[in-house]
Amino acid sequence: MATEIPPAVRNDLDRLRQLEDQLQAVLLRKQQYEGELRNVDKALNELNKLPQDSKVYKVVGTFLLSTTRDEAIQDLNQRKELLDLHLQSLVKQENMLRKQISELENKVKQVLAAGQGGQVQ
């Protein structure tokens, strides 16, 4: 006779799947921000090589606008700060989710190993 998974364990497994989905979403956003941060760093590196009185262009929507080198550097530094803050937040979320996943996995393993199936005795 097949053993049925108790409702409490089923709920824990559902919660585990939700946490893993959330972790994947956080990791994807983190990866996107890291890519954007690399692009910002490359742009800053190139701008810093230019003479101070250089004119540069930036894309705003569907327009290409002229700006000064210093304004472009300032804009990119602000964007970099914002990306760093987002990344710090995502790292905290990632760590929290990993901890919750680990705790829930251990709980489910203990219940299943004990053969109690989550039932109260």
From Swiss-Prot:
GO terms for molecular function: protein folding chaperone; unfolded protein binding. The keyword Chaperone applies. Gene3D superfamilies: 1.10.287.370. SUPFAM superfamilies: Prefoldin (SSF46579). GO terms for cellular component: cytoplasm; prefoldin complex. Keywords: Chaperone, Cytoplasm. HAMAP family: PfdB. This is Prefoldin subunit beta. The lineage of its organism: Archaea, Thermoproteota, Thermoprotei, Thermoproteales, Thermoproteaceae.
